[in-house]
């Protein structure tokens, strides 16, 4: 995953979301694939979709992670708010989407 971090850093010009976070939203909404909901698909494609190990290393272990923010939702909110993971209760804090549930996406 370390080789992907420079690419991730440059992609922060466009916010990121993990495929696993998208899957969690799809499951909650009872959908099987992103194309089943055109609105959700459009929201997801406003961000760069990346693999979960990359976002875990960059966001979960990043310097901006502070105690009390909650569980990172595998979506960034540098330029665009938490759009996709907001559907599962995530909000923006320090450029990362968090929720207070005890589940990691």
UniProtKB/Swiss-Prot annotation:
Q: Which family does it belong to?
A: Belongs to the cyclotide family. Bracelet subfamily.
Q: Which domain of life is it from?
A: Eukaryota
Disulfide pairings: 73-90, 77-92, 82-97
InterPro entries per UniProt? Cyclotide (IPR005535), Cyclotide_bracelet_CS (IPR012323), Cyclotide_sf (IPR036146)
Pfam families, from UniProt?
Cyclotide
What is the stated purpose of this protein?
Answer: Probably participates in a plant defense mechanism. Has cytotoxic activity, active against a human lymphoma cell line with an IC(50) of 3.2 uM.
Note on domains (UniProt): The presence of a 'disulfide through disulfide knot' structurally defines this protein as a knottin.
Q: Report the record's Gene Ontology biological process terms.
A: defense response
- Those residues forming the propeptide, per the database entry, are 10-69, 100-105
Q: Where on this protein does the Cyclopeptide (Gly-Asn) crosslink form? A: 70-99
| Designated name of the protein | Cyclotide vibi-E
Processing after translation: This is a cyclic peptide.
Signal peptide position in this chain? 1-9
Q: What keywords is this UniProt entry annotated with? A: Disulfide bond, Knottin, Plant defense, Signal
């Amino acid at each position: 995953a370390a080789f992907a971090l420079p690419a991730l850093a440059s992609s922060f010009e466009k916010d990121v979301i993990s495929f696993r976070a998208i899957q969690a939203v799809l499951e909650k909404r009872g959908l099987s694939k992103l194309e089943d909901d055109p609105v959700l698909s459009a929201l997801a494609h406003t961000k760069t979709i990346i693999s979960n190990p990359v976002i875990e290393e960059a966001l979960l272990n990043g310097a901006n992670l502070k105690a009390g923010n909650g569980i990172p939702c595998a979506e960034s909110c540098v330029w665009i708010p938490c759009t996709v993971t907001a559907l599962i209760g995530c909000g923006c804090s320090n450029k990362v989407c968090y929720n207070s549930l005890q589940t990691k996406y």
